[in-house]
């Protein structure tokens, strides 16, 4: 039986893009796209092997950001605009990690969705 051939990842030569950081209370997802929104690279705290409450730490967000940046730089990415969504603890550390990985951060935008009094929020936790 013939061996299945793996699809080779095509190197995209993209100079600038957008880094979308989705920081929830439980996880941090970093996705780097081109200016049209087509994904170049992504990473998350959970994908790197962090489990449970460790996923929501700033260190996990930093590692996810570094992994996504390293993968995007292989496609020739040099500068990014950053959009941050969500209330998570990994917001600042993810942005710092992108800059430390060698990507030039040109703009930081907060796109956290704020309801105009929409659905009822979940009840308060009593710990």
From Swiss-Prot:
Keyword presence, Ribonucleoprotein: yes
Name of a matching Pfam family: Ribosomal_S11
GO cellular component: ribonucleoprotein complex; ribosome
GO biological process, alphabetically ordered: translation
Keywords attached to this entry: Ribonucleoprotein, Ribosomal protein, RNA-binding, rRNA-binding
Chain ranges passing through the membrane: none
Signal sequence segment: none
GO molecular function per UniProt: rRNA binding; structural constituent of ribosome
Keyword S-adenosyl-L-methionine: no
Record family assignment: Belongs to the universal ribosomal protein uS11 family.
Primary role: Located on the platform of the 30S subunit, it bridges several disparate RNA helices of the 16S rRNA. Forms part of the Shine-Dalgarno cleft in the 70S ribosome.
Self-association state and partner proteins as the record states: Part of the 30S ribosomal subunit. Interacts with proteins S7 and S18. Binds to IF-3.
Record-linked NCBIfam families: PRK05309.1 (NF003698), uS11_bact (TIGR03632)
Protein name: Small ribosomal subunit protein uS11
Species annotation: Streptococcus sanguinis (strain SK36)
Lineage of the species this protein comes from: Bacteria, Bacillati, Bacillota, Bacilli, Lactobacillales
